[in-house]
């Protein structure tokens, strides 16, 4: 039985961890995940999906704010793991830790060397890519730059957003890891170096990127909305108040960027730099997420054709 230390945080990671837990060839000695966070206005403490799964299986849990130089680092190095598996962990691993195990493998949600970094799924959708994927790679000190063990891809559909693609890639990543790990560990599967000259990066989404730019084409704005749903969520402004936009559809029509060009009891169409978008699901400031029909029956009632949002 191969003894593993697992590191990860979101549901993507938990899906991969569950695959390892269900496989008798592996024993998870401990998991390392991000600290619990206070969420929302009520500051409700929320544990990570990886921590929740570890609690259900009675696995030791380590949650350092920063792994390097921590007491937790000393403790996990004493567990005697054969190797490390990471998936969307969110921290760099100290070299001393990488050197303490026989192997260290990362499950990364992109087709490397494209989209190294923390938000590959967001950028794949926002950039209008036709496919996304997962790369199983060896871990080195440089971010997502290790040799590649295996790759798998899937089409990005017009109906996909970050949430749906996250779920698809988690399953692909789980299966790809379980399929490739035995051959990798036996030496049968030889890792392939990345072409570093082709590397692109996907840094974590900044608050500035969440704001919609109505001068872009309707396809670009549409991709941007999908690439921010369900988190961190794209937004525009209506009378100085933030209006989050979760879903929209491509539409025809012309007008000034951000201008209301169609308003009925059931639809609100906004012009972009080229074409238009029909808003479907929005969230006004201080309100719950709602359909455009509910919005037009409430706060959006005062909007008129010709008005411009986003200012």
Curated annotation (Swiss-Prot):
GO terms for cellular component: cytosol. Signal peptide: none annotated. Its EC number is 2.1.2.9. It comes from the Bacteria. GO terms for molecular function: methionyl-tRNA formyltransferase activity. InterPro entries: Fmt, Formyl_trans_C, Formyl_trans_C_sf, Formyl_transf_N, Formyl_transf_N_sf, Formyl_transferase-like_C_sf, GART_AS, Met-tRNA-FMT_C. It catalyses: L-methionyl-tRNA(fMet) + (6R)-10-formyltetrahydrofolate = N-formyl-L-methionyl-tRNA(fMet) + (6S)-5,6,7,8-tetrahydrofolate + H(+). The keyword Zinc-finger does not apply. Attaches a formyl group to the free amino group of methionyl-tRNA(fMet). The formyl group appears to play a dual role in the initiator identity of N-formylmethionyl-tRNA by promoting its recognition by IF2 and preventing the misappropriation of this tRNA by the elongation apparatus. PANTHER family: METHIONYL-TRNA FORMYLTRANSFERASE, METHIONYL-TRNA FORMYLTRANSFERASE, MITOCHONDRIAL. This is Methionyl-tRNA formyltransferase. It comes from Streptococcus pyogenes serotype M2 (strain MGAS10270). The lineage of its organism: Bacteria, Bacillati, Bacillota, Bacilli, Lactobacillales.
């Amino acid at each position: 039985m191969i003894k593993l230390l697992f590191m990860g945080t979101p549901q993507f990671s938990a899906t991969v961890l569950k695959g390892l837990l269900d496989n008798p060839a592996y024993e998870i000695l401990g998991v390392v995940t991000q600290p619990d966070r206070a969420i929302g206005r009520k500051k409700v403490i929320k544990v990570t999906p990886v921590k929740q799964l570890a609690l259900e299986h009675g696995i030791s849990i380590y949650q350092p704010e920063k792994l390097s130089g921590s007491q937790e680092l000393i403790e996990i190095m004493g567990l005697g793991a054969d190797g490390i598996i990471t998936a969307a962990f969110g921290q760099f691993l100290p070299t001393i830790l990488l050197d303490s195990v026989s192997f260290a493998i990362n499950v990364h949600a992109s087709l490397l060397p494209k989209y190294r970094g923390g938000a590959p799924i967001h950028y794949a959708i926002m950039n209008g890519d036709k496919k996304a994927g997962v790369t199983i790679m060896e871990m080195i000190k440089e971010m997502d730059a290790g040799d590649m063990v295996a790759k798998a891809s899937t089409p990005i559909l017009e109906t996909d957003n970050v949430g749906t693609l996250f779920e698809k890639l988690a399953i692909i990543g789980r299966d790809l890891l379980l399929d490739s790990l035995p051959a990798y560990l036996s030496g049968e599967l030889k890792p392939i170096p990345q072409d570093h000259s082709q590397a692109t990066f996907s840094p974590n989404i900044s608050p500035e990127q969440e704001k919609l730019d109505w001068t872009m084409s309707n396809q670009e704005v549409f991709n941007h909305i999908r690439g921010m749903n369900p988190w961190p969520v794209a937004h525009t402004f209506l009378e100085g108040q933030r209006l989050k936009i979760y879903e929209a559809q491509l539409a025809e029509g012309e007008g000034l960027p951000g201008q209301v060009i169609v308003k009925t009891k059931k639809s609100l169409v906004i012009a972009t730099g080229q074409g238009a978008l029909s808003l479907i699901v929005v969230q006004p400031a201080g309100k719950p997420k709602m359909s455009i029909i509910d919005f037009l029956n409430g706060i959006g009632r005062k909007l008129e054709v010709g008005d411009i949002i986003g200012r």
